[in-house]
Amino acid sequence: MVNENKWGLLYCPRGGWRSNKRWEKIEKVLKQQGVDYDFVQSENQKSVERLIRMFINNGYKTIVIVGGDSALNDAVNCLMQIDPKERDEVALGVIPNGLMNDFAHFWGFSDSDIEKTVASLKKRRIRKIDLGCIRYVNKKGEKCRRYFLNCINIGLIAAIMNLRRKTHHIFGSRTLSFLCSFILMIFQRLDYKMHVKINSDVIRRRVMTMCIGNGTGYGQTPNAVPYNGLLDVSVVSHPKTTQLFEGIYLFVKGKFLNHKSVHPYRTREVEVLDAQHALIGIDGRLMNTPVGPFQITVIQEVINFLIPV
């Protein structure tokens, strides 16, 4: 078994020509700060869960993901498959290195300040955090569940994020990639027939997009925190074209909830009875569309997460 103070570090390459330089900089900071770690590199989504399980089986108590929201999602889903007592001995940390790093940014971890991030992780300050959980039936008729740290998107934003993943290598800039994806999506389907239950409210109308956030949801659930046992929900009805561009402006400015087409909620459970033809994204990555109704809930204080001092 390994030294309990040694990190199990999982590097998830972001892609692009600067990927190696990014890792060299991170490696240099780790050495400068005297971090004792073992390093593995992921090849794809499936390898993340396999490598996390390898770290756990070999007794690592601190697992640090050098990656983004999707890699963190894979990590927590692996942790949720092990015995709760064993999971309680493991702390999860992150050095932001993904296309989308919203959950890391919530805690104040910066993509650019690697020195500060590593110094904070070394302090091993732990906070127990909540996870969201979607329960659904897949195309094979199997009952499934998937956990999330940040959010689930249903509708337009899920489609935009999928397009953004495909275009970020072209545009380089994350903001430019997102805005271009948004504009491209205007020429496609903008709303979806939905039937949703939130608390005592029943929503049965055409909806452009819905975000269920355990975290800030890429700006759509800006008041959500992953430690209050609640989910924040924003439901966006189909705005007029002028309102749509106003919505883009407010989204970029961080004032998304101020838009007249946005309807915010706070709840412990969301029941989606119908979301016809809408894509579903979980922590920034498309998931296989559930067959029939599905439920989204929150599970309190199940992951030990390393936060800044």
Task: Locate each region found by the language model.
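Short beta->alpha linker loops
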Residues: 43-47, 67-70, 98, 155
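Glycine-rich phosphate/pyrophosphate-binding beta-alpha loops
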Residues: 153, 157, 211-222
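ATP/NTP phosphate-donor binding region
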Residues: 1-66, 77, 119
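Catalytic core of DAGKc-family lipid kinases
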Residues: 10, 33, 81-208
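Short amphipathic alpha-helical segments
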Residues: 21-23, 76-79, 105-107, 223-224
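Short N-terminal binding/cap micro-motifs at the start of the first secondary-structure element
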Residues: 16-20, 159, 219
